[in-house]
């Protein structure tokens, strides 16, 4: 009984823990990176929102510009709830090249698992999303739209949606923002990405606000990412 209660609380803390492409928290990009051929990347970020804290490490392997596999390992801490771990496996396939067509679209499938502190690993949800990306501002910016559906364990399906935008404003500096919503809550997130070494090493500084039926709060998001490893 206690394990079931702990799992329920941890699942409620997972609002907007959908699969995503950095620097976003929810949104997937459908912009194919033409130089990503059999390369690794590692993205890491820390999130703070109200009583909740989390640290994520996410290695990704790009088979080619159109196909990639990412695994996210996340440690969650909640001063008012249950601590635990989360694991997400995500496969993304893109159907075209944005550099050629000016737009891109694809499909993302993900499996989520959780382990409350002291409990076993349990499947928490499966999801499917359709990302669409559009080049704007003569190629210096991107607009993203995601529509999807998630099936939490022992619950009804939840439809999800996200909008995001990014644009390079200075050399090596990109501003980004995203808005997401499902039937239980909303997310607002925005910040700046700075490339220490262009296309190889980046740091992110952002702010987020989360509002759901179970909790609400705001806080910082700090990230660092290595690409083309």
Q: What does each model-identified segment do?
A:
Residues 1-6:
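Bacterial N-terminal signal peptides that target proteins for export
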Residues 12-15:
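N-terminal signal peptide c-region/cleavage motif recognized by signal peptidases
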Residues 18-229:
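Transmembrane beta-barrel domains of Gram-negative outer membranes and organellar outer membranes
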